[in-house]
Each structure stands twice: as structure tokens, then as C-alpha cells.
Regions:
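Mid-to-C-terminal catalytic subdomains of enzymes
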Residues: 1, 6-24, 63-161
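Short, flexible loop segments at boundaries between secondary-structure elements
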Residues: 19-50
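Short linear sequence motifs
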Residues: 42-45, 67, 134, 161-164, ...
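N-terminal glycine-rich phosphate-binding loop for ADP-containing cofactors
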Residues: 49-53, 146
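Extended, charge-rich helix/loop segments that form flexible
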Residues: 59
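Acidic, carboxylate-rich catalytic segments that either coordinate divalent cations
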Residues: 153-182
């Protein structure tokens, strides 16, 4: 049982819902690292974002999250579970809200405000705990990794200053290429 979908459905991705993004801002925060700094022949991700372009250089980030991020998040979990030969179930995977999220509340410091309200209705005498982000041990795991060595990567790429999650992305890409020996 996984609950990744609750962040998507109920507004727990407050860092991605923090503002009405321009195209460039959203691409930068979503991609987090520029492939041109690490790959010899990077492929532009621009066409993926272009499908969500709005007037005045804005992006329909809510639709992007619903279409792209949702698939990305669920398939990552589904793959891990299938490799471990375990059943995968996320009760929120197909859940859609009848009304749009109140972005002002989320931006005002109330991520998952609907869940909190339902909790308070069901358990009126209990205090609502603060949201605690899922711990990410990648900084520790990837601390000593020296970086990719395949020819597809720019060898002068210095990964020492990168956060663990970005090292992990490079590591996974290199492992993928090793598996299929492209």
C-alpha cells in the first residue's frame, strides 16, 4: 500500500504549487539539473513542457502535474514493487477531486488542508500533527560516488557539489545504459 497519490490529489506538493510559474521557472524547478552540464548529447525536454504552454509565457502546471508527474510517480513505485514481486496498490491513483484545490490555502502554509479537515472532523479531540516530509537518505548513500564514467557523460563533470538526489539521477541513468549497453 502506497500513498504517493495523496500528495498529488490533496495538494501535498506545496513546493510545486508555490506560485503561478513561468515556463522557464517551472522547467528549472522540475528538472532541477541541466542535462547539458552532464551529457555529451543531451536531448531537449522542451517539447514535453510546450504542450502545457499558456499565454504570457505561463505553464498549466496543474495539468502538467496531473499528466506527467502522476505517471512518473506511480510508475517509479510500480516498477520497484514489481521487481520485488510484491503487489502494488495506491488508493489515490485514480482519485480525482470534484473541485479544484484552493491554491491560496496551500500557498499560505496548509498543504493537504482537506485531509487535515477530515482528520479534525473524525477525531475532534486530537491535535493535527505537522506534515513531516519523507526522509531522503540519498545524500548519505551517494556521498562517496565519484560520478559517471561512460562516454555519454561529460567526464569533467564534478559531482562533488551535487545533492544526493541529483547524483542518484546520474547513477540511475548510467546503470540503465550499462544494462542495455547502448
Amino acid at each position: 500500500l502506497v500513498g504517493e497519490g495523496s500528495d498529488i490529489v490533496f495538494g501535498g506538493l506545496d513546493w510545486l504549487l508555490a506560485k503561478d510559474w513561468t515556463m522557464e521557472e517551472f522547467e528549472k524547478i522540475y528538472i532541477s539539473m541541466d542535462p547539458e552540464n552532464f551529457l555529451r548529447n543531451p536531448v531537449s525536454l522542451q517539447p514535453i513542457f510546450e504542450r502545457y504552454r499558456l499565454p504570457n509565457n505561463r505553464i498549466d502546471y496543474l495539468r502538467f502535474l496531473d499528466d506527467i508527474f502522476r505517471i512518473e510517480a506511480y510508475t517509479a513505485y510500480e516498477n520497484a514493487f514489481s521487481v520485488a514481486e510484491m503487489p502494488y496498490f495506491d488508493p489515490f491513483e485514480r482519485l480525482k477531486m470534484a473541485t479544484p484545490l484552493d491554491l491560496n490555502r496551500i500557498r499560505g502554509g496548509e498543504p493537504k488542508y482537506i485531509v487535515r479537515e477530515l482528520f479534525k472532523m473524525r477525531y475532534p479531540n486530537c491535535s493535527i500533527p505537522c506534515k513531516i516530509r519523507m526522509p531522503n537518505p540519498l545524500d548519505c548513500y551517494m556521498r562517496d560516488w565519484k560520478g559517471p564514467s561512460r562516454r555519454e557523460f561529460i567526464l569533467k563533470s564534478d559531482v562533488r557539489g551535487l545533492k544526493g538526489k541529483w547524483k542518484w539521477q546520474l547513477y540511475c541513468l548510467e546503470r540503465f545504459l550499462n544494462l542495455y549497453d547502448f
